[in-house]
C-alpha cells in the first residue's frame, strides 16, 4: 500500500540506494520492510523518506538487478546469441536466489528487464531471425531458464519434513536433540522415488545430481535451437 502525504522531519542518514542494497542482501523474494529497517538500524517509518511502499522497493530492486545483467554481444550467429543470453540469465538467477520465483509470481516483474530483453531481441534480428521468431525464441528460452532455476532452488533447499510426512514411506525422523532431520529437495525426491513400486519414472527423468546443478538446461536450450532451425 502506498503511503500518502509527504514525509516530514530531518533528512534520513541513508539513501534510496542504501535501502535497495539492504533489501537485496536480505533476498529479493524474502525482504520485508521491517527487516530492511532493522538492517539499516532505523525505524520502519524512516524508510518512507526514500520509498513509498514495499512494491516501490521491489521495483527499485528489480531495476538494480536488470542493470547488472551482463549480455554477451560477441556471438556471430543467432544460435550463439541465444545460448549466451540463456547463460547470462542463469548467472543472474544464481546471483539473486528467489528472483526466478519473483519473476514467475509478480505479473509485472519481467517488464523491469525491458532494456536487456530489447537488446537481446535486436541482436537476434541482426543475426538473421525475423522479429516475431526472435521474440518467441526469447520468451521460450526465458521461460525455460527461469522455470528450471526455480525447480533447482527447490531441490537445493531444505524441505521441512512436516510438509511431506503424508507422502508414501515418510517417517518422522529426528536427529539428536529432538529436532526433525530435514532433507534437501533432491534428497526428498530420491527418497520418494524409492517408494514408486511398479510405476517408476523413466531413468532419464529420475532424480540425479543435475537437479541441483543446471537441471539439464544446456540440453533443453539445444533442443529449442534445433526446433527453430528446423522451422526455418
Please describe what each predicted stretch is.
Residues 6-35, 39, 63:
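Short, amphipathic alpha-helix enriched in basic
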Residues 104-140, 182-199, 215:
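Amphipathic alpha-helical packing segments from all-alpha helical-bundle domains
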Residues 18, 56, 84, 115, ...:
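Amphipathic alpha-helical interaction segments
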Residues 1-2, 154-232:
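C-terminal peripheral helix-coil segments that are non-catalytic and often amphipathic
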Amino acid at each position: 500500500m502506498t503511503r500518502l502525504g509527504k514525509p516530514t522531519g530531518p533528512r534520513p542518514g541513508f539513501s534510496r540506494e542504501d535501502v535497495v542494497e539492504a533489501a537485496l542482501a536480505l533476498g529479493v523474494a524474502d525482504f520485508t520492510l521491517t527487516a530492511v529497517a532493522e538492517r539499516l538500524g532505523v525505524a520502519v517509518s524512516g524508510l518512507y523518506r526514500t520509498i513509498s511502499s514495499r512494491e516501490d522497493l521491489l521495483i527499485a530492486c528489480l531495476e538494480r538487478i536488470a542493470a547488472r545483467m551482463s549480455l554477451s554481444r560477441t556471438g556471430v550467429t543467432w544460435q550463439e546469441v541465444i545460448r549466451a543470453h540463456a547463460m547470462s540469465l542463469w548467472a543472474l538467477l544464481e546471483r539473486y536466489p528467489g528472483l526466478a520465483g519473483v519473476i514467475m509470481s509478480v505479473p509485472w516483474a519481467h517488464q523491469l528487464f525491458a532494456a536487456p530483453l530489447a537488446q537481446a531481441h535486436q541482436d537476434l534480428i541482426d543475426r538473421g531471425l525475423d522479429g516475431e521468431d526472435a521474440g518467441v525464441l526469447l520468451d521460450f528460452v526465458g521461460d525455460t531458464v527461469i522455470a528450471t532455476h526455480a525447480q533447482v532452488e527447490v531441490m537445493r533447499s531444505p524441505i521441512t519434513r512436516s510438509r511431506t510426512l503424508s507422502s508414501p514411506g515418510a517417517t518422522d525422523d529426528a536427529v539428536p536433540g529432538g529436532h526433525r532431520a530435514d532433507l534437501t529437495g533432491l534428497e526428498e525426491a530420491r527418497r520418494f522415488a524409492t517408494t514408486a513400486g511398479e510405476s517408476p519414472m523413466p531413468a532419464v527423468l529420475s532424480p540425479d545430481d543435475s537437479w541441483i546443478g543446471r537441471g539439464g538446461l544446456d540440453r533443453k536450450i539445444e533442443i529449442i535451437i534445433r526446433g527453430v532451425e528446423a522451422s526455418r
